[in-house]
Curated annotation (Swiss-Prot):
Lineage, opening ranks: Eukaryota, Metazoa, Chordata, Craniata, Vertebrata
Catalytic reaction list: GTP + H2O = GDP + phosphate + H(+)
Biased composition (Basic and acidic residues): 522-531, 551-563
Stored InterPro entries: Dynamin, Dynamin_GTPase, Dynamin_GTPase_CS, Dynamin_N, Dynamin_stalk, G_DYNAMIN_dom, GED, GED_dom
Gene: dnm1l
Record-annotated Dynamin-type G domain positions: 22-301
Domain of life of the source: Eukaryota
Membrane topology: Peripheral membrane protein
Protein name as it appears in the record: Dynamin-1-like protein
GO BP term, example: peroxisome fission
Stated family: Belongs to the TRAFAC class dynamin-like GTPase superfamily. Dynamin/Fzo/YdjA family.
Protein's organism: Danio rerio (Zebrafish)
Pfam families reported for this sequence: Dynamin_M, Dynamin_N, GED
Record region (G3 motif): 145-148
Keywords carried by this UniProt record: Biological rhythms, Coated pit, Cytoplasm, Cytoplasmic vesicle, Golgi apparatus, GTP-binding, Hydrolase, Lipid-binding, Membrane, Mitochondrion, Mitochondrion outer membrane, Nucleotide-binding, Peroxisome, Synapse
Top EC category: hydrolase
Length: 691
């Protein structure tokens, strides 16, 4: 299982090369308040002085420290290959292959790199420094040294320095694959430990938190850390380990880490003999190594899955970016053809990318025809906007100066044309809706079907312009045709239409039935000449003509109907003087039986004929729109695009990639290469390494 930590280090190196943190790798994050001894603990684990030391804020950038254990045989081999003279050496990621054998030089490089990014005062940065230490005296570990938690800004630190440091710490410890090393000084109250507090925010159960108590030798006289080290004060599931740091005086006197560890062991044996074997720097190193190995083992399956998923995603992304253009003519023709095909397929419903959130393309056009347009027509009232006064006025105006003996046919035509004209507006609105949907299909194809177009924004804009122009040209042609469909219906009122003749026949039968009912109700003393007159009317009505039908209705003056209250233009009643220069004024009175009958007949005929015309329009308008707009655009789109865009003079301009496309392609290629390498690294892990 020791082989797992080098594997994770390899993965970290792989992803560091592309500057990505999309994979959350197992690591140990060191958290603590400022000057609590975090860096001292890390130096004890390394066994060398390599970190900047001092008072105040010293660690101002995250330091990712990879400790790599090397055997003597491997060390000799590496020394020969790299020309390294020494058993321990370090490498920074930002200095590439440069090898440092002087640890003072490593410390100076950390300070220089920190100041380069964070400034030479007290500011912080979240950009990490990557350092790898090779030594036979270390165990395999990956640790992250983080800036200490502080409260008050100093130097050129911003006022929200506490919040910045907190967010930086949370960024690392929120990683569910990280172990939190919470460092607290023994000469402070554990109940007020900021490190444990912030660790508990992201790990409330303490499943991945290990507490370290530093400065055991600096506790007040007469006190000890027995209860704390036994876990009686703050219980932590992964354990609690005490260590002794070097003092600033020891550092000034050049006391080595090895001597410090030896003195630490002596102090623990003297002060805490029963706990000495479960505390100290060496025990901490072994514990961290064991915890990290088990943690990596638990995280590995999910890590494999994540890398495989990301590989597939970046492969798809790279494919969508396409290869650099070599043959411009072929590429342009291919993109134009693909767009035209996808546009037509979206209308036909055979597109590769089917929208699931809403209707689009041909399905939406169908919805417009049969739901939107169909329901709008059905909601148009055949007699809407037509009152009894309008009907009677039309009848009177149609007779001119002569009194009407029968209902004039001209009044029917006049009124029915007025009603049919109302179908034109929803028909033209239907054309507009289909036109808008065909515009939307352009964007749909750009977003879902032909992502290659996004590589070439000028080509995309040119295609949109050509298709929009084609649709714009077809719109007036289609509108004209739809207008003509309504005009055709208005041009000739066909009263011999089979459906209309049936309606007239039914009306004849209805009026005849009403007349017979009235005849039965007449008193027996009715004179014979009236009876004969009725028979004569029946004979005249039997011809089946419109005039005969209306004449039959004229006999029904005795029929009991609801008397409509209305105002009609009428002559002044007898007995009153009239100024002939006055305009006739409406007079409120009850309609006569004949006026009621005339209105009813005209209204029934209008309704019957209107329904016939509405049915025709509901059928013919979608056909006209399909022929003159949809199908015409489908058939001519390819040739229109080729004719407008496939020109040698336009090739260079149209196939100019967007500024960031080449960069994004390179980034995606680098990331894919890193993921493939990471997948290869994980694949090398033998199952025996896991146990």
């Amino acid at each position: 299982m020791e082989a797992l930590i080098p594997v994770i280090n390899k993965l970290q190196d792989v992803f560091n090369t592309v500057g990505a943190d999309i994979i959350q790798l197992p690591q140990i994050a060191v958290v603590g308040t400022q000057s609590s001894g975090k860096s001292s603990v890390l130096e004890s684990l390394v066994g060398r002085d390599l970190l900047p030391r001092g008072t105040g804020i010293v660690t101002r950038r995250p330091l990712i420290l990879q400790l790599v254990h090397v055997d003597p045989e491997d060390r000799r081999k590496t020394s020969e290959e790299n020309g390294v003279d020494g058993e321990e050496w370090g490498k920074f990621l930002h200095t590439k292959n440069k090898i440092y054998t002087d640890f003072d030089e490593i410390r100076q490089e950390i300070e220089n790199e920190t100041e380069r990014v964070s400034g030479n005062n007290k500011g912080i940065s979240d950009e990490p420094i990557h350092l790898k230490i090779f030594s036979p005296h270390v165990v395999n570990l990956t640790l992250v040294d983080l800036p200490g938690i502080t409260k008050v800004p100093v130097g050129d630190q911003p006022k929200d320095i506490e919040l910045q440091i907190r967010e930086l710490i949370l960024k690392y410890i929120s990683n569910p694959n990280s172990i939190i090393l919470a460092v607290t000084a023994a000469n402070t109250d554990m109940a007020t430990s900021e490190a444990l507090k912030v660790a508990r925010e992201v790990d409330p159960d303490g499943r991945r938190t290990l507490a370290v108590v530093t400065k055991l030798d600096l506790m007040d006289a007469g006190t000890d850390a027995m209860d704390v080290l036994m876990g009686r004060v703050i219980p932590v599931k992964l354990g609690l380990i005490g260590v002794v740091n070097r003092s600033q005086l020891d550092i000034n006197n050049k006391k080595s880490v090895a001597d410090s560890i030896r003195d630490e062991h002596g102090f623990l044996q003297k002060k805490y003999p029963s706990l000495a074997n479960r505390n100290g720097t060496k025990y901490l190193a072994r514990t961290l190594n064991r915890l990290l190995m088990h943690h990596i083992r638990d995280c590995l399956p999910e890590l494999k899955t994540r890398i495989n998923v990301l590989s597939a995603q970046y492969q798809s992304l790279l494919s969508s970016y396409g290869e650099p253009v070599e043959d411009m003519s072929a590429t342009l023709l291919q993109l134009i053809t693909k767009f035209a095909t996808e546009y037509c397929n979206t209308i036909e419903g055979t597109a590769k990318y089917i929208e699931t959130a809403e209707l689009c393309g041909g399905a939406r056009i169908c919805y417009i025809f049969h739901e939107t347009f169909g329901r709008t027509l059905e909601s148009v009232d055949p007699l809407g906007g037509l009152t009894t006064i309008d009907v009677l006025t039309a009848i009177r105006n149609a007779t001119g100066p002569r009194p009407a003996l029968f209902v004039p046919e001209v009044s029917f035509e006049l009124l029915v044309k007025r009603q049919v004209k109302r179908l034109e507006e929803p028909s033209l609105r239907c054309v507009e809706l289909v036109h808008e949907e065909m515009q939307r299909i352009i964007q749909h194809c750009s977003n879902y079907s032909t992502q290659e177009l996004l590589r070439f924004p000028k080509l995309h804009d040119a295609i949109v312009e050509v298709v929009t122009s084609l649709l714009r040209k077809r719109l007036p042609v289609t509108n004209e045709m739809v207008h003509n469909l309504v005009a055709i219906e208005l041009a000739y009122i066909n009263t011999k239409h089979p459906d209309f003749a049936d309606a007239c026949g039914l009306m004849n039968n209805n009026i005849e039935e009403q007349r017979r009912n009235r005849m039965r109700e007449l008193p027996t003393s009715v004179p014979r000449d009236k009876m004969a007159g009725g028979a004569q009317a029946e004979q005249e009505g039997g011809t089946g003509t419109w005039r005969g039908m209306l004449k039959k209705g004229d006999e029904g003056q005795g029929e009991e109907k609801t008397k409509l209250q209305s105002s009609i233009p009428a002559s002044p009643q007898k007995g009153h003087a009239v100024n002939l220069l006055d305009v006739p004024v409406p007079v409120a009175r009850k309609l006569s039986a004949r006026e009621q009958r005339d209105c009813e007949v005209i209204e029934r005929l209008i309704k019957s004929y209107f329904l016939i015309v509405r049915k025709n329009i509901q059928d013919s308008v979608p056909k006209a729109v399909m022929h003159f707009l949809v199908n015409h655009v489908k058939d001519s789109l390819q040739s229109e695009l080729v004719g407008q865009l496939y020109k040698p003079a336009l090739l260079d301009d149209l196939l100019t990639e967007s500024e960031d496309m080449a960069q994004r392609r390179n980034e995606a290629a680098d990331m894919l290469k890193a993921l493939q390498k990471a997948s290869q690294v994980i694949a090398e892990i033998r199952e025996t390494h896991l146990w």
